[in-house]
């Protein structure tokens, strides 16, 4: 089986780039730099796959094309490789990842389903199908797929991170924290890095983001990563986390509170004037 990149948790949700249709009068009131420019449609820009190319060469070329976001061309090359290696779970998973990057969720799910039909123990495919469900806000089935992935591979930080995001979205905060903690134990950089495929870690919706940042700050503090804890505390503060005062009593922050940078951070809090 060919190597298979994983999809992590989304520093911003994959659906965060919706365009709003606004009255034409509005656009006359804003500068050109503030206007939203509609992206051109996806196009094929390179020659089609050569009929005599090997499956390995086609797959390697598809990887290169996907890395530079030429997704339609990448799909052509992956599918040409798949024609030479029918029912390859690795190729089906990579096709699904590419479709996921294009936000073609129905097609991506179908590809992951086919992948799992070819290989029922393909942990990455369960995780990636869970991402599709997460983006469709089907958090319950996303949780089930993430747990299936973890049952097959308990060493992947991204699986636990994705599980935490789905539980967080369901407002199941305590089990979400447990999942996030395991993710950090496996990879302290799990919330910072992007996967080899370019999809960032899934994160909760904007409405839950402040609480999420505070939760991550607490996890990093508990594990002794003061720099990262302070970074996420700053984010929670900037996003107006309503229970930020808990930082003074939560035992996990005991070490962080002794850091001079903590005092500098809380000094930046806006003063709320009484009405």
Summary of predicted features, one role per range:
Residues 30-52, 193-196, 200-210, 242-275:
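Terminal, low-structured helical/coil segments at or just beyond the last alpha-helical repeat
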Residues 51-84, 90, 97, 101:
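Alpha-helical segment of the N-proximal tetratricopeptide repeat
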Residues 68-80, 101-114, 136-148, 170-182, ...:
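Structural signature of tandem alpha-helical TPR/SEL1-like repeats
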Residues 66, 93, 100, 117, ...:
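Position-specific recognition of the canonical hydrophobic site in helix A of tetratricopeptide repeat
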Residues 55, 89-90, 123-124, 157-158, ...:
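Helix-start (N-cap) detector for alpha-helical repeat units in TPR-like alpha-solenoids
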